[in-house]
């Protein structure tokens, strides 16, 4: 009768029966060996990624650091409005340039101006959903019981 070999533990089990394999796989040593095996595998993958990135950097395929220069500088500096400058339409005189206009009347031919996002929210891109404010709907929080789970059936 063939014996069962455990690759993680590097040992043969006494019998090739489901009960022996189940007992072995639930043991502390086996679980520790499996955990160690996958930790070692992840470390090897990380080292491989580091080596590949280093080789690509040395070959000149990766830029130095695109984020070290900071944001691009604007070409034209707009002076802030002073008390003596006239206000733009919809602005209160002396209001800072970055503030949103307060009074927005109807646009050309009686059309409304476009809707503005609330302060502090970034503009949404195509296909993006608005953020959820109150969490998931109530039916998403309920636990689902399956017919095979006999603990919850009488």
UniProtKB/Swiss-Prot annotation:
Q: Which InterPro entries match?
A: Matrin/U1-C_Znf_C2H2, Matrin/U1-like-C_Znf_C2H2, U1-CZ_Znf_C2H2, U1_snRNP-C, Znf_C2H2_sf
Entry's family note? Belongs to the U1 small nuclear ribonucleoprotein C family.
- Give the matching PROSITE patterns: ZF_MATRIN
Q: Its quaternary structure?
A: U1 snRNP is composed of the 7 core Sm proteins B/B', D1, D2, D3, E, F and G that assemble in a heptameric protein ring on the Sm site of the small nuclear RNA to form the core snRNP, and at least 3 U1 snRNP-specific proteins U1-70K, U1-A and U1-C. U1-C interacts with U1 snRNA and the 5' splice-site region of the pre-mRNA.
Kindly list the GO molecular function terms attached to this UniProt entry.
mRNA binding; pre-mRNA 5'-splice site binding; U1 snRNA binding; zinc ion binding
What biological processes does GO assign it? mRNA 5'-splice site recognition; spliceosomal snRNP assembly
The record lists the organism as Aedes aegypti
- Keywords of this entry: Metal-binding, Nucleus, Ribonucleoprotein, RNA-binding, Zinc, Zinc-finger
Q: What is this protein called?
A: U1 small nuclear ribonucleoprotein C
Q: Name one Pfam family in it.
A: zf-U1
**Localisation per UniProt entry:** Nucleus
Principal location: nucleus
């Amino acid at each position: 009768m063939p014996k069962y070999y455990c690759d993680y533990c590097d040992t043969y089990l006494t019998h090739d029966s489901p009960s022996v394999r189940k007992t072995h796989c639930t043991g502390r040593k086996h679980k520790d060996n499996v955990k160690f095996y996958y930790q070692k595998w992840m470390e090897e993958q990380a080292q491989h990624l580091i080596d590949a990135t280093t080789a690509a950097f040395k070959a000149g395929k990766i830029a130095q650091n695109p984020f070290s220069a900071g944001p691009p500088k604007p070409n034209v500096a707009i002076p802030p409005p002073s008390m003596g400058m006239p206000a733009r339409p919809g602005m209160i005189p002396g209001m800072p340039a970055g503030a949103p206009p307060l009074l927005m009347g109807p646009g050309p031919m009686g059309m409304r101006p476009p809707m503005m996002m609330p302060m502090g929210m970034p503009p949404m891109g195509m296909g993006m959903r608005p953020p959820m404010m109150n969490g998931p709907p109530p039916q998403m929080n309920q636990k689902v019981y399956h017919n095979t789970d006999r603990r919850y059936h009488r």
